[in-house]
């Protein structure tokens, strides 16, 4: 296998899995999940080394309470289905944030680039989310990425800093079914000389 083979296989195998059970795979503990996310947060590059990425892992009663609040806020029975599934079928969720403080400081320190820094923060949080999702898949977990950001933020524990903006929720558990079949478009990559 080529030096990139394992990496590309991990990316290929990372899929959206909605059918979960609220368990961790045998031999995997919550500390493994925490350590994995921590290493990714620490080592994912950020603009000017601003280190804007943050994460909180919710499990147990906190997980159920937050997703119950999200489900309760949804206006229709159909809209409640996904947050109820997150609440009832997942083991936990990684809540991803960006800390707005470092981005605001960069905007003050480098006004000519001020408009670019929020985009940079968005790119780096996306990198953290996809890498975490891929790594959790390697641990034997299934996961799906949700974006109930404002609803989740309003239900978080009070000690989560106000300057942290919720970016997404990576809902995880043991997969109970294979992912749905994925179709691809032909993404041509041109090379110019």
Swiss-Prot record:
Entry cofactors: FMN
Any one Gene Ontology BP term: cellular response to oxidative stress
Gene Ontology terms for molecular function: oxidoreductase activity, acting on NAD(P)H
InterPro entries hit by this protein: Frm2/Hbn1, Nitroreductase, Nitroreductase-like
Gene3D superfamilies: NADH Oxidase
EC number: 1.7.1.9
Catalysed transformations (reactions): 4-(hydroxyamino)quinoline N-oxide + 2 NAD(+) + H2O = 4-nitroquinoline N-oxide + 2 NADH + 2 H(+)
Keywords in alphabetical order: Cytoplasm, Fatty acid metabolism, Lipid metabolism, Nucleus, Oxidoreductase
Recorded GO CC terms: cytoplasm; nucleus
Subcellular location: Cytoplasm; Nucleus
Chain's role: Type II nitroreductase, able to reduce 4-nitroquinoline N-oxide (4-NQO) into 4-aminoquinoline-N-oxide (4-AQO) via 4-hydroxyaminoquinoline (4-HAQO), using NADH as reductant. involved in the oxidative stress response. Plays a possible role in the metal stress response. Involved in negative regulation of fatty acid metabolism.
Xref: PANTHER family: FATTY ACID REPRESSION MUTANT PROTEIN 2-RELATED
The protein's name in its UniProt record: nitroreductase FRM2
